[in-house]
Structure formats: structure tokens, C-alpha cells
């Protein structure tokens, strides 16, 4: 398609890596992770390629966080037309999803109970590497360094299990929280991405604990105004 950006082989490789990281863990890679994966001598080389991708309109770079990389939906729409000619990863189809926005969740009731739904949004599926089931409004800055900020809308796919490193929506007692998941021996740790916050350690004595879903994307709240 004519309006699809022309990328170098290395830029294509980095964009693939960003998509893969978002699909597997719910967040983009850091510059250091990109450098290590692609054999760069320093994170500065990764930053130069990311800046080039941003200039071409493929991604958006968010300052103040090591994982502040956003895939832009209009670019994904154009790249979809190439049917994997540029990218090794399959790109999502161009259908719209009606996603409910979950507000505050009452203790003991399902997260998608009708009383929790503030409203619904029509969102293009091409924005996400995997199909989400709902949006959850982020409250607080505990996941700041993963690029997840207060007021953002987290796209969540329903799930009851998680792998180490994935960003999850978890219910712990009366609270619903967004954290990075890690299982260590007999305990589960819910890790913030902000040094101002302490990890949450889940033990058999912690009370009711349940994984509600996996993060598969993020929408800035201002984009839906």
C-alpha cells in the first residue's frame, strides 16, 4: 500500500520485536532489551532506530519511562495491507471491537458485571496483538516505568493463568490491581514498575486471589475524548 511507511530491514526487525514483546508480556521492551536481543553494543543504538521509527510515524515515544514505546494504530492499518510482506508476525485484522470500559469493581462480584461497566467503545482490532475482552481504567502510577500511566485504558484479555513477566489484572481480596506477575516457589509476587511502590506478595494467608486477565495493549485516555 502506497501510504505504508518504508522501513529498513533493521527497523522492521525492531518493530517485530516491539510487537512480540507486547504480545507476550503486555508491555514493550526497554532500549537495553532491544540492544541485547539484536546484538547492539549499547542501548543508544536502539534509541537511534526508535527515533527513526518515530519520525516515520510508525511508533510514538513516551518520555519519562524506559518502556515508553507505542505502536500507532494508523500505521498498523497500513501495514496490515502488506499481508506480512514486511513483517514476520501476522498483523491483526481490521475489524472493530465493542469493548466495555470497567470502572470500579465491587468486592465479590465478576469484573464484567453490568454494574461495573461505565460505557463501551468501538476500537479497531488492529491496535492490539491479541483480542481484548474489555478496557480497564488505570488508577495510580505504580506501573509508570512500563509506560502505563494514571488514567490510561488498559486493554485486557480474560485469563485465569499467567506466565512470569506478564502484566496481569489481579483481584486480591477487595482490590483489583495491575501488576507484573512472578511466581517464586510457593508464592506469587505482583511487581510494580515504579520504585516508589512495594511488591505485593501473595501467600495462602493473603486471602482471596484471582487473576482476571492479561494486558494486551494500552490506550491513552485522551484518544477516546
Swiss-Prot record:
InterPro entries given in the database record = LexA, LexA-like, LexA/Signal_pep-like_sf, LexA_DNA-bd_dom, LexA_repressor, Peptidase_S24_LexA, Peptidase_S24_S26A/B/C, WH-like_DNA-bd_sf
The family note in this entry says: Belongs to the peptidase S24 family.
Its ancestry begins with: Bacteria, Pseudomonadati, Pseudomonadota, Betaproteobacteria, Burkholderiales
EC annotation from Swiss-Prot or TrEMBL: 3.4.21.88
Q: Where is this site: Cleavage?
A: 107-108
Quaternary structure note: Homodimer.
Keyword Mitochondrion attributed: no
**Source species, domain of life:** Bacteria
Q: What does this protein do?
A: Represses a number of genes involved in the response to DNA damage (SOS response), including recA and lexA. In the presence of single-stranded DNA, RecA interacts with LexA causing an autocatalytic cleavage which disrupts the DNA-binding part of LexA, leading to derepression of the SOS regulon and eventually DNA repair.
Enumerate the HAMAP family for this protein.
LexA
Question: What is this protein called in UniProt?
Answer: LexA repressor
Q: Give the active-site positions.
A: 142, 179
- DNA-binding: present as a keyword of the record? yes
Q: Tell me what reaction this enzyme catalyses.
A: Hydrolysis of Ala-|-Gly bond in repressor LexA
> Which keywords accompany this UniProt record?
Autocatalytic cleavage, DNA damage, DNA repair, DNA replication, DNA-binding, Hydrolase, Repressor, SOS response, Transcription, Transcription regulation
User: Which part of the chain engages DNA, per the record?
Assistant: 31-51
As one GO molecular function, the record gives: serine-type endopeptidase activity
SUPFAM superfamilies referenced in this protein's UniProt entry, alphabetically: LexA/Signal peptidase (SSF51306), Winged helix' DNA-binding domain (SSF46785)
The record's Gene Ontology biological-process terms are: DNA repair; DNA replication; negative regulation of DNA-templated transcription; proteolysis; SOS response
Amino acid at each position: 500500500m502506497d501510504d505504508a511507511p518504508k522501513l529498513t530491514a533493521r527497523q522492521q526487525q525492531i518493530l517485530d520485536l516491539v510487537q512480540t514483546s507486547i504480545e507476550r508480556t503486555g508491555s514493550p521492551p526497554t532500549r537495553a532489551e532491544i540492544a541485547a536481543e539484536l546484538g547492539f553494543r549499547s542501548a543508544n543504538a536502539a534509541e537511534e532506530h526508535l527515533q527513526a521509527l518515530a519520525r516515520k510515524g510508525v511508533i510514538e515515544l513516551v518520555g519519562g519511562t524506559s518502556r515508553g514505546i507505542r505502536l500507532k494504530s494508523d500505521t498498523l492499518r497500513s501495514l496490515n495491507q502488506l499481508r506480512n510482506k514486511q513483517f514476520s508476525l501476522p498483523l491483526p485484522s481490521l475489524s472493530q471491537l465493542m469493548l466495555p470500559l470497567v470502572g470500579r469493581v465491587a468486592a465479590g462480584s465478576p469484573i464484567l458485571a453490568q454494574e461495573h461497566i461505565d460505557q463501551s467503545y468501538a476500537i479497531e482490532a488492529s491496535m492490539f496483538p491479541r483480542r481484548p475482552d474489555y478496557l480497564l481504567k488505570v488508577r495510580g502510577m505504580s506501573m509508570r516505568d512500563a509506560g502505563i500511566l494514571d488514567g490510561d485504558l488498559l486493554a485486557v484479555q480474560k485469563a485465569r493463568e499467567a506466565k512470569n513477566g506478564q502484566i496481569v489484572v489481579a483481584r486480591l481480596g477487595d482490590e483489583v490491581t495491575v501488576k507484573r506477575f512472578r511466581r517464586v516457589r510457593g508464592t506469587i509476587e505482583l511487581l510494580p514498575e515504579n520504585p516508589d511502590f512495594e511488591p505485593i506478595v501473595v501467600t495462602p494467608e493473603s486471602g482471596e486471589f484471582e487473576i482476571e486477565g492479561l494486558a494486551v495493549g494500552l490506550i491513552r485516555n485522551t484518544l477516546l475524548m
